[in-house]
Every structure is written in structure tokens, then in C-alpha cells.
Amino acid sequence: MPIQVLPPQLANQIAAGEVVERPASVVKELVENSLDAGATRIDIDIERGGAKLIRIRDNGCGIKKDELALALARHATSKIASQDDLEAIISLGFRGEALASISSVSRLTLTSRTAEQQEAWQAYAEGRDMNVTVKPAAHPVGTTLEVLDLFYNTPARRKFLRTEKTEFNHIDEIIRRIALARFDVTINLSHNGKIVRQYRAVPEGGQKERRLGAICGTAFLEQALAIEWQHGDLTLRGWVADPNHTTPALAEIQYCYVNGRMMRDRLINHAIRQACEDKLGADQQPAFVLYLEIDPHQVDVNVHPAKHEVRFHQSRLVHDFIYQGVLSVLQQQLETPLPLDDEPQPAPRSIPENRVAAGRNHFAEPAAREPVAPRYTPAPASGSRPAAPWPNAQPGYQKQQGEVYRQLLQTPAPMQKPKAPEPQEPALAANSQSFGRVLTIVHSDCALLERDGNISLLSLPVAERWLRQAQLTPGEAPVCAQPLLIPLRLKVSAEEKSALEKAQSALAELGIDFQSDAQHVTIRAVPLPLRQQNLQILIPELIGYLAKQSVFEPGNIAQWIARNLMSEHAQWSMAQAITLLADVERLCPQLVKTPPGGLLQSVDLHPAIKALKDE
């Protein structure tokens, strides 16, 4: 057989083998075209799982009459025009293959109208040479695409379609993923004349959690931890479910987007799985909805026929950025201590004696630590990056990328005003800022400590209360507020409303944000220590306390809240006690020098030693 150029229809059918896998593939390509056209409303009508009819209607910018024939031609697009555009793709579509491929395996009709045109025009391609016919039509501004009898002329492909229910489930999943990517677009999905999904557009700054709950379910919403992580041109936003409460049903929720494009990327999944591995079983999977924003020049989306995968120019950097972003939220949720700096310090104040037993940042240590220590690194403060390398970091990557990677994982020292030179004080003893070494747990809530040969008992609930008070008390800046996924709405009396309004500035310093109307108050954000509390009990009690006060000082309110917080530990473990002491020593060093009543009690061993010697 001689070499010859294939007919246009046959060439398009071959290309359709990569682009059009099943009806859901058609829906994905056409809806993405609608989004690229600036549509704010998209209606999808499906019949018989998409095998009979797929109709996509949008209110986008439309297509001019002169461009309708080009729209159905191969490699014709308005989204890129040069090599530079290909290297920084910001649109969902860019190859110009979808419509030509779909029209070659179905009866496709394209109807469109722009705002400048007085009438709409309809185009369809038919025949061996795919000649396009254009005729007038009635249509509002926007575009409608009808795909009839998918694979009617390729029986082999049609034979491999699954049942109507299965094919529609694939379409439904595609729409769910797209709806999570574009909260600003109204999307309606119907099957066989019956409306199945209605996702209303969320206004800018609105409650995205309503759509999140409609798509992912209330179980995910209740366990979701919000992520907001940024470094340079990299931004990570979204939600990850608490791994301690992940169920097999929740594990099916794994939605990831890169610059608004839905992805199934192994690098991203590995980073998330690695961040959660200490809290997940071997057969468990994390649940997440995450949005990664990156400079378009740093990612290549033209590596997969269906554009399901991307390639990052600095894959290691992106991997560890995502890993650290997810890990930081999980660590904050567990309220673990800040990382210890590995650089030399003026005095060893920040490394108490018992931190060796506690397991300081062992990612930076070559030797293995005691198994009592947590496997994870302590969580960074908001916006910070730990300075230690990751446990699986590969030493052989390039120096230039290594420098960028090092900058990602380090936090610049805050700018401070120069101070006048002061006389150098003698360095403190290594254990002068430490309660001592934890020996064991006594009666489930007391830690037996040893320091300088002396034994003492420390009340862990009291230490936890002092820590909460320190975390809640504002310093030079207000306490960071954590937005609630589901705001808490409470009915209040006129007296309580007046007290709340008077205390609003003090509460704002504590990270408590609310809005009030005639008879209700809506709590929108709380500080981190309150995130896991039963707010439906705590907040009304706080409002009752404020109603009895005449002066509203943040410190007094923080003290009241700390005393009324429920402890997360019914029984304390050694690791939990060591972690708590590390936090208290860091945030409340004055308690080490002058322990308040009820916190620390020395144990006199001399009578026991004397009795032993007298035997």
C-alpha cells in the first residue's frame, strides 16, 4: 500500500481515540470550552448516559459567524498563537482538536451568537471531507453544542460503552470536579429530562463551603481543615480531612487542581500521602480538595492527551511545598510545638535538657531517636517554614535548585531595630529553662520529673491551661483567627448583644470574629486552641461571662477561656507530656522560674532514702 494522506474524517477519528474516550470525555472538553469563553452559567443535558445526546449551553462570549467553520477544524484555536503562549498556558483548552475529533465520531451541531451580532448562526460538519455548513439560527448570546449519537460511525468504540448508569456516573463525577474548580459559575446537570445537579454560583467572598458540602458531603465538611500556604509564586489553598477520622468513604474524595485545571498527578498525591502517613493506616488514603497556583511558565500541561497530568519544572520544590503545607495544617490541628532552630544560638535557652528525650527535630539528626518521640516534625507557625531537610530528601539534586529549596524551607529572621550593646550576661545553665526530664506518668494526669537530682510532680491539666492562656493572649499582634467552615449562629438577648458589641475589639485581638443582627450573633472565626472545642457550649458560656463584665480586657477574657476549655487528653502519654512541656517552656518561661500554685509540687525523697539506709 503506498503512502498517502488520510482523509480528514479518518484522521479526526484517529485523533478522537485519544481525546474522546467516552461520553464523559466529551462533556469535559465542551464544558472547559464554555469556561474559557467566560461563561457564568452552564446547562448540561444528557440522554441515555450521553450515548444518545449531550447538549451544553452557556452564556459565554460566543463565536463569530466567520469563525464557526474554523472552530470545527483541526488545530484551530483562539487560545494560543505562538510558542511563548504554549509555554505559559492559562486556558483549559489550547490544542484545537476537541471539536474536530468529536464531530468526526458523532452528529455535532454548533450554534452560537456574540453580543455584536444581531442573529445567531449554526454550523455542522458532515461527509468524508468534513465540509462545514453554516446557516442562520435563533439563539441568545452564548453557545450551544449538541452531540447526537456518539460513536454512531465507529461501532467498535460504541460496543465498549458501559451501561447508561455507569456512563452517567462518569459524567456526574466530571461535573463535580469542575464545580469544585469554579465556584463562580452556575452549573446545572440533567439526565433524561430530570434535573440531577444544581450548583449555584458563589459570589466573591461568599461561603464556598455550601458547594463543598453539596459535592463532598457533610462528613468531609465536618472533618475538613482549611489550608492557606504560600511561598513566592506558589500558593496552596483548599481543605484536607483530619486523617484521624478518615473513613473509606471519605478517602474517595481526592480532588486536586493546578491553576484551575483538574489533575490526577502522582507527585501531588505522593506529597499529600507522605504528609499524612503518620496518621493513616497502611490501607488508608487521605481525603482532600486542594488548589495549587503556580507560575504558568513553571508547569507544562501539554504532556497528556486528556490533560490529566502535568510536569513541573522544579518538581522537588513543588513536592516539598505541598508536603509542608499539608503537614503544617495537620500539626497546627494537633497543636504541636514550634520547630527548634538548628543554627547556633547565643545561649541554649530554647533547647531544654529533656528535649533530648522528647526527640527534637530529628529530621536534622543522622542518628535514630527514642521511639517515645513523635515521628513528625513540630509544626511551624503560620507562614513559616522549618529549616531541617525532609526525611526522604535526595542529596544529589542540583545546587541551584537546592538553594531555592533551602529558601522555601527557611523563614527570614524578622527585622528588628538595632539595640544598644548590653553587658554580656553569663550563659544560663542548660536546664535553667526546663522543668526537667519526664520520668513517667502518675495517676494518668501528672508527670514525674527529675531535675538536678530532685524529683517533682507536675499537673498536666494545669500546665495545659497555662499554655492555652499564653496561646490566647495577644502579644504585639492579635491572635491569628481560624475561619470556621460552618459559622456558628446563636440567638442572644439584648443585654448579651450589647456586651458582645462592647467586647468586639477585645475579642478580635483574641482571634474571635463575629457578626450580629437583631437577635442573633454569627461566630465566623475562632483562634486555633478553640478549633476542636465544642463551640455550641463554650461560646454561649463566654457570652454569659461577658454580659456580667463592665471592663473587657483581652488578658482577662483569655484567662477565662483557658480555664473553661475542655482538655483533649483523658489520659496522658509520655510523648504528650513531653510535647506539652516543650510548649510551656517556650511560651511560658516564667513558669519555670516561678511555678504558680497547683502546677508543680516537689517530692521529698530524703525520708524514704533515710528509711532504706536505716534498715
From Swiss-Prot:
The keyword DNA repair applies. Residues 363-397 are annotated as: Disordered. SUPFAM superfamilies: ATPase domain of HSP90 chaperone/DNA topoisomerase II/histidine kinase (SSF55874), DNA mismatch repair protein MutL (SSF118116), Ribosomal protein S5 domain 2-like (SSF54211). InterPro entries: DNA_mismatch_repair_CS (IPR014762), DNA_mismatch_repair_MutL (IPR020667), DNA_mismatch_S5_2-like (IPR013507), HATPase_C_sf (IPR036890), MutL/Mlh/PMS (IPR002099), MutL/Mlh/Pms-like (IPR038973), MutL_C (IPR014790), MutL_C_dimsub (IPR042120). Keywords: DNA damage, DNA repair. One of its GO terms (molecular function) is mismatched DNA binding. It comes from the Bacteria. Residues 364-391 have a biased composition (Low complexity). This is DNA mismatch repair protein MutL. It comes from Escherichia coli (strain 55989 / EAEC). The gene is mutL.
